């Protein structure tokens, strides 16, 4: 895939996400900060928070509907305080939380017969979105690698993320794929590195 961000830009993205969270937790105000270059372009992005290796929050924008800097700030705050799976993050936790930002390519619908869909999903490269009626679910590319899924399992898990039966990809659901570029802290507040998706589970 085309590199979306340089390593330096990726570091800026992660630092911005952390700053946005901590500013919000301290002031209860959304950080007002603009960056130039790639950050002025519309991009999809997800912010993922982990604490001692466990997921602590993950929310984002699948589609490029906002400037990247705005999308990072909003997704970071939402991952910290609005993920319904978790209690809101406390400021005191931020010394134990690793911040990860995934920059997305625009999702493209996979134009294939349902039974052929797995052949169009490359594990370690593609993330998935499944839509059917009012239901929609998304899994980032790294999820399939972390949980050692094959393409069929990844499709089924994305269906279930949408609140749909696991075989919905065989029964008429729309399936979209996208790619992601991941930057994360090696340790809380530490060095920011680009992550090779294919090594996420190692």
From Swiss-Prot:
Domain of life: Archaea
Pfam families named among the record's database cross-references: AMMECR1
Signal peptide coordinates: none
Domain AMMECR1: 8-194
Coiled coil, from the record: none
SUPFAM superfamilies in alphabetical order: AMMECR1-like
NCBIfam families registered for this protein in UniProt: AmmeMemoSam_A, PRK00801.1, TIGR00296 family protein
Protein name (record): Protein AF_1969
Species of the source: Archaeoglobus fulgidus (strain ATCC 49558 / DSM 4304 / JCM 9628 / NBRC 100126 / VC-16)
